[in-house]
Design a protein with these regions (language model features):
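Hydrophobic anchor at the start of a short beta-strand
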Residues: 2, 18, 43-45, 66, ...
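P-loop NTPase switch/communication element
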Residues: 54-62
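Flexible active-site lid/hinge loop adjacent to a nucleotide/diphosphate
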Residues: 61-150, 155-169
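Nucleotide phosphate-binding/pyrophosphate-handling subdomain across enzymes
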Residues: 44, 166-177
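Conserved helicase ATPase motor motifs in RecA-like P-loop NTPase domains
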Residues: 19-33
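A conserved segment at the C-terminal end of the G1
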Residues: 29-46
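Short beta-strand-centered segment that lines the nucleotide-binding/catalytic pocket of NTP-utilizing
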Residues: 43-55
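Short, basic phosphate-binding NTP loop
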Residues: 1-20, 41, 159
Length: 177
């Protein structure tokens, strides 16, 4: 039986609130934005994963912690036990095809971020990304239990005008918001 770092991490941190982020681009930025918002709101937050702090570098946390994970397709590929109360797929574009073979396989592996969720959990998908849209079909076919929330970019221009920061002038970072 194979136990992945994600599975072991979840087993050690079942009591924490886990937010996981995957996608081809923007994972680190999105994790940092969420971390800053939650820290500003006085939550105890740790961000781990491919963002520079390996997942298993975090020891068992207390119930009052929010753990933000940046997760790659490599980590999701063999994970069977991992569960995240909030999981998001930001976008998908052709990448890592030398490992996953084709886009269909890559998309299916990315969708595994939702497989361990239950009825009280939330799944967020960028519904304006053509590859991410196909995950909605996987969601229905697999009869996944979490609440699916498709995210659209409608109205984001109003928000960006209120945030006077040159960082959000790039298309990718606007999409991350």
């Amino acid at each position: 039986k194979i136990i992945t770092d994600l599975d072991l991490f979840f087993d050690l941190n079942k009591d924490a609130l886990i937010i996981s982020i995957t996608g081809t681009n923007g994972k680190s930025t999105t994790c940092k934005i969420i971390e800053k918002i939650l820290k500003f709101a006085k939550y105890n937050v740790k961000t781990v994963g491919n963002i520079g702090n390996p997942i298993l570098s975090t020891s068992k946390t207390k119930k009052k912690y929010v753990l933000i994970l940046e997760i790659s397709s490599y980590q999701l590929q063999y994970s069977k036990l991992f569960r995240s109360q909030h999981a998001a797929i930001l976008n998908i574009s052709p990448d890592h095809l030398e490992r996953h073979g084709n886009m269909k396989s890559y998309i299916k592996i990315k969708s595994r971020i939702f497989f361990g969720q239950n009825i009280s959990d939330y799944s967020y998908i960028n519904s304006t990304n053509k590859y991410s849209k196909s995950i909605i079909n996987i969601f229905k076919t697999k009869k996944l239990k979490s609440k699916l929330i498709p995210i659209k970019k409608l109205g984001y221009n109003l928000l960006i005008k209120k945030i006077n920061n040159k960082y959000f002038k790039s298309k990718g970072n606007i999409e991350n918001m």
